Structures are given as structure tokens and as C-alpha cells.
Amino acid sequence: QRSFFLLGYTVLDVAIQSQALSRYAIGYILRGTKYIYEGDKRQTLTRGDVFYLGIGHHYIENFPENGQPFEQVLFYYTPADLQRILMHLNITYGLNISNEHSCENCRNRTHVAMPAWNSIRNFFVNTNNDLRDEDFHRDETAENIKMTELIYLIASHEDCCIKSKLLSNVDAAKENFEQIVYDHIFKDISIEELS
């Protein structure tokens, strides 16, 4: 069973929906408006926005645009998926990842959104075109490559809320012994201390 997947979908009807996510999600609005409700506040996302949804309940409303259906592309992933991809990017390509960004938005919300930068916008537009190909939906390797590319584009970008939320998801997987060893591989520490 695949641990993450791509989902592109359209919506014609409008209603507030409760979504209970068991994985993290990163998405992009291709057309329409998305409202995310949190208590008595409403955040508006429009065409060209990239967004992050954390695990848990989200109250969302998707609006069509000018008679055309609402359209978005979503990637779902687990902390283990993210950890595996980041380790691959670091070991294979030497990608050093850091993040100094922290703001009230990142700390207190289970969702964040921002206008997409050029490379991420192009990525999602191309991914949407790939999703129109039926064979793509059955190609796990293509999905893995797309997910790795998405993580790279976010992790290599300047510090921002999306990057901060994404990288905070690795912490949930840090209990993994392999990750602990990897974290200490260049430190003067014994195997006994690691265990």
C-alpha cells in the first residue's frame, strides 16, 4: 500500500465540509477559492496559493470560479515518508536543510497558506497535467518522484511558513532508531549511548 498519494479534484457544489486528516497535506489552488475556518476566523485562499493542512479536523469550503469548478492538487504524506525523502535528498544530493522561520501563524495553526513562488507554481501546474493521464495514477514510481520533487522545492526554498510546517513534521518520526543514528553519525558518540 502506498503511504502517500496525489489527488487532483474538482468541486461544483458549495458547502462547508469537515475533513478529518490522518496524514499531512500540501496543496495548490488551480481554480476557485478555498475558505478554511478556525473558530470564528476564516482564511481565504485563491488561485495560485500553496497551502499546508496538518493532521486533525479542518472545516473547509471550496467555491467554483466564474462557472468553472473549484480545482486543486493535494499531496498527502506521513512523517515517515517525509523523513525518508529528506534523508534521500541529503545523502544523494547533499541537500542541507535548515529553517529559522517561526511566527505566531506557524506555531498556533494547523494550516498555513501563502502565494506560491514560481517553481512551486510550475510544479503543481505540471502535476495537474500529469494527473489527467490515467496511467500516471497507477505509477507508484512517478508518484514517488513527484513527492520528492515537491519536498525538494519546499525544503530548498527560503524560510517561510510552509517550509516551517513541513519540517516540523519530521519531529514526529524522530523516535525512529535509524533517524537517531543518522542525527549522531558524525558526533563522537558510542553505540551504547545511542541505544
Model-assigned labels for residue ranges:
Residues I120-F123, T127:
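Amphipathic alpha-helices that form helix-helix packing interfaces
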Residues Q1-R2, R23-G27, N126, T141-I145, ...:
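Short acidic/polar alpha-helix capping motifs at helix-coil junctions
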Residues L89-T92, T127, H184:
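Alpha-helix boundary/capping residues
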Residues S98-N118, L131-E193:
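Short, Lys/Arg-enriched, Trp-marked, Pro/Gly-tolerant hinge/linker segments that flank
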Residues L74-A80, N105, T127-N129, A173, ...:
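Juxtamembrane/interfacial segments around transmembrane helices
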Residues R2-N99:
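N-terminal regulatory/effector-sensing and dimerization cores
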Residues A25-G27, S168, S195:
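Small-side-chain structural scaffolding
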